[in-house]
Structure formats: C-alpha cells, structure tokens
Amino acid sequence: MNFRMEHTMQPLPPEKHEDAEIAAGFLSAMANPKRLLILDSLVKEEMAVGALAHKVGLSQSALSQHLSKLRAQNLVSTRRDAQTIYYSSSSDAVLKILGALSDIYGDDTDAVEEKPLVRKSA
C-alpha cells in the first residue's frame, strides 16, 4: 500500500467529530447491562413502568434513572394512559445494536450480563 503522508495528515472534518459525539452518546446510553435488558424488553413490547421494573429486576426508582438516560438519547418513547406511563422502543439503531450483540453473544440477552465482552482465544 502506498499512503501519501499529506492525505493522512489532514484533520477530520467537523461533521466527523459531530458524528462521533452522537455515536458515543448513543453507545454510552446503552453501555449498562440493565439498560440492555430494558431495551431488549421494550423492542419486543410496550410496558408499564411497574411491569418493566419487575421484569428487569430493578426498583422503580433505579429504573427511572436508567429510563432517563435512554430518553435523553431518544432510545425509548412514552405513552400516557390516565396515570400509567408506558415505554417502548422502535429505534432502528437500537434494533441493529441488539441484533449485533445477539449475533456475538447468543440469543439470550441475559447472557450479555454473564459473558465477558472480550472472548479469550483458545
């Protein structure tokens, strides 16, 4: 390969930096085992807060903190019915990332909590 030095020395355009910031925010919001379980649940069905808290094993207070981070990145949406708030996720980006994680770690999302992120070579 013949790389020209002047080409590699050019600074990245501002758009690249902006894209990297957006991607980092997205990945940061997902970078928690409980948030992965929350998103995995919400892409499959809309859920009320109480049911979601029970399903993922969190108090409603702890769940609220996680949902706040996911809402900040627009990874979940809400719907109110009287006094009940329902959450769901239909983000294509979330579906793609969860699909990639499933391909790497298997179909059982609970395995994401149990398996190391880097596999040891044999």
UniProtKB/Swiss-Prot annotation:
Disulfide bonds: none
Residue span(s) of domain HTH arsR-type: 15-109
Gene3D superfamilies (alphabetical): Winged helix-like DNA-binding domain superfamily/Winged helix DNA-binding domain
Coiled coil (residue ranges): none
Keyword list, A-Z: DNA-binding, Nodulation, Repressor, Transcription, Transcription regulation
Pfam families, alphabetized: HTH_5
UniProt cross-references to InterPro entries, sorted A to Z: ArsR-like_HTH, HTH_ArsR_DNA-bd_dom, Metal_resp_trans_reg, WH-like_DNA-bd_sf, WH_DNA-bd_sf
An annotated Gene Ontology molecular function: DNA-binding transcription factor activity
PROSITE patterns per record: HTH_ARSR_2 (PS50987)
DNA-binding region: 49-68
Top-level taxon of origin: Bacteria
CDD domains referenced in this protein's UniProt entry, alphabetically: HTH_ARSR (cd00090)
Function description: Negative transacting factor controlling the nod regulon. May control the expression of nodD1, nodD2, nodD3 and nodABC genes.
Miscellaneous comment as given in the Swiss-Prot or TrEMBL entry: R.meliloti strain 1021 has a frameshift mutation in the nolR gene that disrupt the protein coding region.
Quaternary assembly: Binds to the operator site in homodimeric form.
Name recorded for this polypeptide: Nodulation protein NolR
Native species: Rhizobium meliloti
Lineage: Bacteria, Pseudomonadati, Pseudomonadota, Alphaproteobacteria, Hyphomicrobiales
